[in-house]
Amino acid sequence: MVRGLFIGRFQPPHWGHVWAIKAILSEVDEVIIVLGSAQFNYIEKDPFTVGERIWMLREGLREGGVDLSRVIIVPVPNIENNAAWLSHIKSYLPPFQVAYTGNPFVAMLLKEGGVEVRQQPIFDRGKYVSTRIREMMIKGDSTWRELVPNSVARIIDEVKGVERLRVIITGEAEPHRW
């Protein structure tokens, strides 16, 4: 059995993520999806909690026709030691044989740790980017809904994610600066 690794923040999950995961599953038997930065939430870059991201990702994958029995979702908090990062990640995961990433820095860390790295399948990178989707939400551009599965949009509505983002950007959501 070949198990692949796919790391992301999924803030929020979008169709590009779903399509990448489907493409990865065409090459491996199972995929471990790491929800990185698991400890961060309610900040502009990471507005959703890890629980909300798990929920959105599972529902978005289900809507996209992904067999969830082949998917393992694992939240992993960040550490501030890049040399120890791979060991940290591995301590949370079952064994994997290959990793998929489009991030050159992450690829370097994985390769230095002896992991086979493959290019992450990328679908219309200019369009399907979580940063862009969050910016659209903040600006009131409702076409962000076209970029995410309907189930993800419903969850964002349910948790009042757009309203949350608009409050976060006021600067009042920075307790570390109080």
UniProtKB/Swiss-Prot annotation:
Protein name: Nicotinamide-nucleotide adenylyltransferase
Organism domain of life: Archaea
Keyword Transmembrane part of the UniProt annotation: no
BP GO terms, sorted: NAD biosynthetic process
Enzyme Commission no: 2.7.7.1
Gene3D superfamilies with a match to the protein in the record: HUPs
Compartmental location: Cytoplasm
Alphabetized GO MF terms: ATP binding; nicotinamide-nucleotide adenylyltransferase activity
Reaction catalysed by this enzyme: beta-nicotinamide D-ribonucleotide + ATP + H(+) = diphosphate + NAD(+)
A GO-annotated cellular component: cytoplasm
Chief location category: cytoplasm
Alphabetical list of InterPro entries matching this protein: Cyt_trans-like (IPR004821), NMN_Atrans_arc (IPR006418), Rossmann-like_a/b/a_fold (IPR014729)
Protein family according to the UniProt entry: Belongs to the archaeal NMN adenylyltransferase family.
This protein's UniProt keywords: ATP-binding, Cytoplasm, NAD, Nucleotide-binding, Nucleotidyltransferase, Pyridine nucleotide biosynthesis, Transferase
Pathway(s) per entry: Cofactor biosynthesis; NAD(+) biosynthesis; NAD(+) from nicotinamide D-ribonucleotide: step 1/1
Top-rank EC class of the record's enzyme: transferase
UniProt entry tagged with the keyword Transferase: yes
PANTHER family from the UniProt entry: BIFUNCTIONAL NMN ADENYLYLTRANSFERASE_NUDIX HYDROLASE, PHOSPHOPANTETHEINE ADENYLYLTRANSFERASE
SUPFAM superfamilies: Nucleotidylyl transferase (SSF52374)
